[in-house]
Each structure stands twice: as C-alpha cells, then as structure tokens.
Amino acid sequence: MTTLQPRGPYSQDELKKLYPDELQLQLVQVLMRHGERSPVSARFQNAGLQPYWPYCSAARRMVSATMEANSSDWTPLQWRRRLETFGNDDGPVIARGPRGEVDDVCNMGELTDKGRETTSQLGTRLRRLYVDQLGFLPQMIHNTDFLYLRATPIPRALESMQEAFFGMYPPYARAAACPPPTIITRSPSDETLFPNDGGCRRFAQLSRAFAQRTADRWNETDEMEYLNFLIGKWMPESSKRVAVDSHPRLSGIMDTINSTLAHGPETRLPKEFYDKRGLAIIEKIGVEEWFTGYNESEEYRSLGIGGLMGDVVSRMVGSVEHNGQDGLFETGGENEPKYEQSSSSTSTGKGLLSIFGLGKKTEAGPIGIARKKLSDLSETERSKLDGYYVRIRYNDEVVTVPGCRPQGKHLDGDQSFCTLAEFKNIVDKFTPAHWKKDCLSNLDAPAFPKIKEPAGY
C-alpha cells in the first residue's frame, strides 16, 4: 500500500534498447495494482490508530445512474456518502475521522485520494511512453475499440482502472463524440484476475496448507521473538503473541503498517511498527506465506494464476492470428485491441513474478490455436508464432524468464525477449483446461507435491 517511486521518462538511448529496430511493437498488456487504500479492517486502535480515515474525498462526489419513472431517460444522481457505525451504547453514530471529520471518511479497504492520484499518474506515465514517445497509441481518440480494459469486482480495482484511463486519455485527448470506454468485469465466482481462494475450493486448501507450513516454520523463531519484543504489547488479549496465524495475522499487521506509511500523520502507528529490521522480517515471512506455493507446485500455479495467464497468452496468440481472441469479441468493437490493461491487487503482480521463477453478448469466435497447447499444434499452426516475442517488465524493470534463456528460445542477443512459442509452452503447463472443474478436484489429495516443481520452465 506504499507508493512506488517511479523513474523518469526513458531517454532515446534507453528506448532503442527496450524497443529494437528489428522488432515492431504489436500488443501491450498491462497488469496494474490498485492504488493506495485504507486497511481492510480496523486494527491497533489501542495504539492510537483511528479506524476511520479522512482520505476519501470521493465520498462528497458520488454519482449513480438513475432511471426516471415511466421513462427510459437516465439521469446522473449526485450524492454525498457518510458512514454509520455502532456507538458506545450500541446505537447508531456517524463514523468520524481522527479530527472529528464526518465527510471524506473512507470505508474499509477503500481507494484513497492518494491512491487515485498515483493511479492517475500511472496513466499519465503510460501515455508519455506509448503515445508521446513510441507513437504506438493515438494522441486523440474517437473510439476505444483499440483498448481492452478489465478490472476485478472489487471497487478499488475498478476505480483505479478508471483513474488510469483518465490519466492516459484525459478529456482533451478524447473527441466530443468518443463513446465511453468498455470495462470488462466478472462475477466473483468466475474471477481469475486474482488468486481466488473464495471461488476455488482446492486452491483454498493449497493456500491454507502453505500458510500453515509458514506458521510452523516461523512462529517459534528468533525473528518472531523480535517482532513480539517490538509490537507484542499492542496485540489483543485474545491473541497476545505476534505470529503468522495470530489474530490479527502477521499479513494483516503488514497490511495496516503499509497503509499507514502511504498516508498522513493523522493515521500513524507508534514508531516500533516502523523498525527497519522488523519490517524486513514481516515482508520476508509474508512473501513466503503468500507466494512460495507458486515456486514449488504446478497445481498451485495452475489454480492460482493459470487461468489469468492462459487468457493473457490467448490474447497474444489471438493478436497474431487476428481471430478476435485478442479481446475484440469482449469489447464489441470493430478494431483489434492494441493495448490491454487489467486492474487487480498485489497478489496478482507478485504471483505473476513467482510463476516465472522470479458485457454485450456476442457469438463466440473461432477457437484457433490460442487455447491449444503448443504440443498439440501442427507444424503449420506452430509456424504462425514464428517471429513474435514476449517481454515482461515489472515496475519498469525488465524480467527474464528462466525457461527462455536457452539458445533458440529468445531473440538473439537479448534473453529478455522470449519467443512467443516458448512463452506459450511455459504457460501451457499451468493453464487449467477447466478451471472450475479443477477447483473441485483432488480435494482429498496432499497439498504439497512429492517433489518441488520449479517455476519458470
């Protein structure tokens, strides 16, 4: 929940290295994390941290689409939101911020003004690169057919997407007749844009098992003793010791710390929570709890992030085949998407690094080769992928997939450009053929594989 400090614009020399003359940029896919937010639950009120934060000015400016009675006319309804909670006598009271604020008060896990600012700035940075510097996208848009935008059903993800779009194409860059953009969402049970333990029983089993293993490894260590020395006195009576599986969990403690770091002095914890060694320990354990499964288990990769990566690669191959599977059918436009952006959470971005080792109803399009495994393709089908490359960048840093390092699996002279064929081959291994069916399979099987199944190959 703390802000990435972005680098400045790329120089011309950097652009030449990132985008070699012998290659032509064809498709950009951006996976963004939602912006800064308030904590998802109220913690450490005994340490002076107020449960309700005054950083959500959008609460004064809410807008809803309303339909007039006996008419098909729609009118935007502007309204102001205030939050209500329990008072000391269990009666209703208006939630207040640290200084008694009743407006601008955030709900739990809500995108804050800071989060809106940074995601809008992300859109501006993307415009600078893909519009101004590379000329890949148009300066002025008359429609949004070339865009594929998707967000999870969590409001902060959708709002972050909207802010990023606004930063990339502010009002002056949209023609007066430009229709509103289409943003794709799914129901929670169908969502694969984040690791969906709520919609996938088997993945819930796996994630709990890896979390428990982390607890067994770390709860009785010197590192955990140090955390208890620092902040144990603020733990609740019902769970006095800091632990991976305490209440609040260690990951929940990290959530609150990071949220406070991203915002103002009115919502800060005591200085012990920001001890550098303590923060490093919390982050190390949190990464193990949440992401080690991707490194060790192909089933974990498949159910946790495989559906999303299958979609990502399908759109890459669809862009090569020009068969509509690059997002054209979903958006209902006439032109194939050139730029795709999805808004989710930290668990998606970090999960993607880990797996590499590091609307309007339309008729379904042709299956093509996008969802076929590489091993099932004919020579003619496989040849369609020749000459296309995939590169991953994470927070402006180029990432090289281990399985793409061998000769013939990358662009000569640059291992970061993986051949589309090899990238698809790696992703095929953990792309579920039937995600919902697989989520109900192996429920009696062990959570851990017999031997570790390394990621990135």
Go through the PLM ranges and name each one.
Residues 1-148, 152-340, 346-457:
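Signature for phosphate-centric chemistry
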